[in-house]
């Protein structure tokens, strides 16, 4: 999808096959992906979200988005500087960066009621293999999930949910091993 959006502006994105809009402040627009500071609900900034541009069906900038942006600006939540530097935000560079940095992230595809959290175990030209992090904060090393890179709609990372599971893992799970 050819899109024209501005950095530092709050938008809502409609993703193919999903009912829920994904909202956030645009940080970077790349070749294949957009990076937003994710606004989970109301005015709560919760990590980063990468949205695959080929699955964006529409972009909303209504009175609701403009009001939300004003509230976020009033509470100094719009001056977000991404701590990541992914060249061109292309599919290849994105997944290489996630793998090289050992980033724990969430993948969302078609079904918005299902997601997978983990880190890249291995990758090929077209696929990634994810070591899953369970809802109990444990690495399931006996299992892996395979995803076609081109089919991934949304990647989220540095969210409170993921960071909480990782903190629990570090404190309780790794200590007991």
Identify the residue ranges that each predicted region occupies.
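Intrinsic, low-complexity N-terminal interaction/targeting segments
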Residues: 102-106, 115-116, 121-122, 127-129
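Short aromatic-glycine-enriched beta-strand elements
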Residues: 32-36, 127-131
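Short glycine-rich, low-complexity segments
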Residues: 1-21, 35, 40-113, 134-177
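Short beta-strand-centered aromatic/proline hotspots
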Residues: 20-28, 116-122
